[in-house]
């Protein structure tokens, strides 16, 4: 396609493409241009609202990986994620900014998505039901199964009289039969024992189906699975009694269970045996040769215990003497030889009396042989001990053993314990108040302990708390420790790791039971997060010199007037600091991988815990205020350190640099705040994290209603910072009303920042805010303005704030949305409280002056004008784009041509596509349309060119068309085609058929007459007219002040045409062509000369 034709195509289609580009630019402007985010640092902007969590014992604010920019990019809102780890009451979340505050109770549904204790009237956040099978081996002679249930996480001292705990129903399934039992949780410990009487037929071997092989007898017994469900109690607080046995066959019992009821929870397995097996013996080894064995059990008065004595098979001793000493309450009543053919056993009577020690001499016979015996040792004799009634019950009786060999060689003393009790104990169970320990002692040095109580269970199901004679031992003291009295487990900060289901063993008499706990430890090293690690001087911002501030020593090349004035020095940038970590534990299974408290993508904000142990290594270079704000002091490099409270170990380090380079404040973002709304939502990435979204209300609804402002500053190095973190004494904000009829400004000396009050209805950019340095550092009477910003105001009386403002956005998706608008509240606190660094904003780590920690809100992007440094648009209101349509609705601010915004400007975005997707699709559509137009024009041109190929003979007989070329030196062009003929026949653009291609390619205009029935018609008038008749082009036109060439084609007409041909260029002289070439390129001019010469030759 030749260049002239391409120009023609562009001439026709450029309006369409320009319109599409303009439409696309408006879409992208309303949706938000993602590239504008690059003007900011990694720290997102947000409404600097303060969050506090009340009524919670342990709570943390969170950070999810790679989600801060997506969730906090709006000056109007702030999203924060938090975790309620431990609480005995419903927590309350408070959000405050300036004089406005709002509270919201965190509902239990968000903290407990699936609560098995929904039937109780108590707050059961940390409750966890634990089941203990007292005996997993069940014999036909005693076909009873007992399961102890208790609640972990329930405060034992916080018991109310009207507390209603749920009932538990236990199920045992074997083949097609079911047995059930029930109990109700009660008491301070919240426990109960459920009993099941198994059917005797269950102890027989499993039924063999025809055609299958008979199953081999399992040595571990026949397994039976146990399950339980949770149910509400009756009107009287009792559980519904169920039949212990069911004779009819039920398919695994499921047909008898209400499917709509609570689901079955697995307890574990038990094993059934038909007969008692020989009980296992415990061994008390006296030395390498002799050992005492006994059966661990509880005995009563009159019971006789037998102690077998064995000797190693490889022992070379042929003679030894065993001494057994007892105290009151125990009597040795007999000794008998177990292998009389091998050993000769005799009891000496060296001592007399009822409780005299027994001396037993064993002599190996010469002809004896122990080859018939099996095992590493064989039994020599048995000693019978009778138990008498002790004075105090329960009691522990001791039997002391010692072996003597010829030559006065003796062994160490060995002690056997005999437990005497009138009760028939079947098990002991250690109960812990909590199921987990969060080891914050590593961070704070304060011990974290969990109370433990040990209870015994008798054969009839009676539960008794054991206060004495309990022994305990931790399986790994690098993870968890236990007190000497076995009444609590604890961590003191000296632990090395965490672990899932770490075991602490508790023993009472011959019974023992493990306590499993999960210990979470902070992952080291900790992560120190600083919003800006390179702090610069701020050009033009002078602050008074105090003892803690020193001027930079490397600024000698700068003018002294620039660096300081009247005892002032340049301000250094401030940064925000917080400390994050993950709580982890070694998994219980093999592999050694780490388990996370919330997940590998979540970090916990622990700034408040380690605030007292965080310091700057060189305080002269930088200063840390409140553990959350870092202020540059002097040029240099230093580190932020977190020290261990128990040792000299450094838990974390972060390098900070204070530079000599100066930065300037390039923009001041202003957000109007007339009130706050608060909503809560469950995190989709974790069932324990909760998102809180605080949104600033913007609408002024009644006369004299007051509003506060929130400001962010942007520096030339790209960093953005909320103005709240700077000391209010180092600057002042001056607000000016641009329309005092609509809003007025109060500048009360007691208040740090100006207050805006509504007067009459109106809207627009009505307030200008100036950031001015402190008065003591002004070098002249003219105030030094650091930055200027504008605020968009909308005043509409009597209108609900829900419709016009994005602050009343509704959440979609799972979760609960609760809102409380306080836009009509008047300030109830002095402004210096919320503006000063000593105020409530920086009191704790819940303040979170960092990247946002939460879900999605509207994103507000400060946009720059062309040729300006300002990040605000012409309307000075922020363009919003949604960042996540599933968790927060998108509201788009479409710009108006007149620079104003009506009440319907905020439009709901499609919930199906994201903003980036819509923008990309629009761009793709424009490109596709442009390609389609190009192809259509190519085909059209090819068809026209094919039809224009006429025989050479016909060309000779045709007269040539002649073009009149005119040049205008004026800067005005015709704006429209009003001077052209309006009829359809006279508005046709075509190429004269009287020329061949070589000639027609030099026609620089296609405005020719249209041929109808072989007759050619010319235009009604010439295109170029005298300058007096021309219509002036607007001075702002992009084509103004340029020379324009306009060509008009006049074609030959038939001889009978009433208008003669005039101004034929064929008859023009060569001098007439020269003026045409004044503004053409040399090559184009030469081609025009050649063309004219050919025309002369043809003539």
Swiss-Prot record:
Pfam family, one: Ig_TMEM132_2nd
Secretion signal span: 1-30
Subcellular location: Membrane
Membrane topology: Single-pass type I membrane protein
Residue intervals passing through the bilayer: 916-936
Keywords: Glycoprotein, Membrane, Signal, Transmembrane, Transmembrane helix
Cytoplasmic compartment spans: 937-1099
Residues in compartment: Extracellular: 31-915
Glycan attachment sites: 505
Domain of life, source organism: Eukaryota
Tissue specificity annotation: Expressed in mature oligodendrocytes. Detected in the brain, lung, pancreas and testis. Highly expressed in mature neurons of the adult nervous system.
Biased composition (Low complexity): 835-848
Presence of keyword DNA-binding: no
Region (Disordered), start-end ranges: 797-858
GO CC annotations on file: membrane
Record's function text: Regulate neuronals morphology via inhibition of the WAVE regulatory complex (WCR), a complex that controls F-actin cytoskeletal dynamics.
Assembly behavior: Interacts (via C-terminus) with NCKAP.
PANTHER family per the UniProt record, alphabetical: DETONATOR, ISOFORM E, TRANSMEMBRANE PROTEIN 132D
Protein name listed in UniProt: Transmembrane protein 132D
Native source organism of the sequence: Homo sapiens (Human)
